[in-house]
């Protein structure tokens, strides 16, 4: 996750530095300062300041937009590193597994880990059921259904995605 944040900050820095460096190279307007073409003659604008700059044109504001998120990300990364490293006096013995230490670090990671474990268990149960059905079809035990030679599975333990989804193979 921190690599994603760092890459976003890097892209933001590159974009802002590009805008900062090349903003002075933009073409200046060809009309004189304070004059606007109005028909065939020029109309003079009143009270036009020398340098009109909006908040988007402020280089310091863009620099602030880049530096503040970068500092925040660095502080978060340092705090995460400090959480992972515990002092030697507080470390447990060899009884605690390193997996359990990592799981206690973040509740989001813990939830994702538990979800993945449940999905893995469900997938193993499903594949086991498919293998049992395939083996039963191959041996013909317990069923009156007789399969043709072309429908007989070559390996009752090998399960393909096409067989799970019920699609016929093109070969």
From Swiss-Prot:
Region described as Disordered: spans on this chain: 81-107
GO biological process: cell differentiation; spermatogenesis
Residues in coiled coil: 114-139
Subcellular location: Nucleus inner membrane
Keyword annotations of the record: Coiled coil, Differentiation, Membrane, Nucleus, Signal, Spermatogenesis, Transmembrane, Transmembrane helix
Residue stretches spanning the membrane: 53-73
Extracellular side: 20-52
Pfam family, one: FAM209
Chain ranges on the Cytoplasmic side, renumbered to this chain: 74-171
Topology in the lipid bilayer: Single-pass type I membrane protein
Protein's UniProt keywords contain Coiled coil: yes
Residues spanning the signal sequence: 1-19
InterPro entries per record: FAM209
Gene Ontology cellular-component terms listed: extracellular exosome; nuclear inner membrane; nucleus
Entry's family note: Belongs to the FAM209 family.
Other notes: The primate lineage appears to have undergone gene duplication of FAM209, such that humans contain FAM209A and FAM209B.
Function: May play a role in sperm acrosome biogenesis.
Subunit structure: Interacts with DPY19L2. Interacts with CYLC1; the interaction may be relevant for proper acrosome attachment to the nuclear envelope.
Protein name, as recorded: Protein FAM209A
Organism, as annotated: Homo sapiens
Organism lineage: Eukaryota, Metazoa, Chordata, Craniata, Vertebrata
């Amino acid at each position: 996750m921190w690599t994603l944040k760092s890459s976003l900050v890097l892209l933001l820095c590159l974009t802002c530095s590009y805008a900062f460096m090349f903003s002075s190279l933009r073409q200046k307007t060809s009309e004189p300062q304070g004059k606007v073409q109005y028909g065939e003659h020029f109309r003079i604008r009143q009270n036009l300041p020398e340098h009109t700059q909006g908040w988007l044109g402020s280089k310091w504001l863009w620099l602030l937009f880049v530096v503040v998120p970068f500092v925040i990300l660095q502080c978060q990364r340092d705090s995460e590193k400090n959480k992972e490293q515990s002092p030697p006096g507080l470390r447990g013995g060899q009884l605690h597994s390193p997996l359990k230490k990592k799981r206690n670090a973040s509740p989001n990671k813990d939830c994702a880990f538990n979800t993945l474990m449940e999905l893995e268990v469900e997938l193993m149960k499903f594949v086991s059921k498919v293998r049992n059905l395939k083996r039963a079809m191959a041996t013909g035990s317990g069923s009156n259904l007789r399969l043709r030679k072309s429908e007989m599975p070559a390996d009752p333990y090998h399960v393909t995605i096409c067989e799970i989804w019920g699609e016929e193979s093109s070969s």
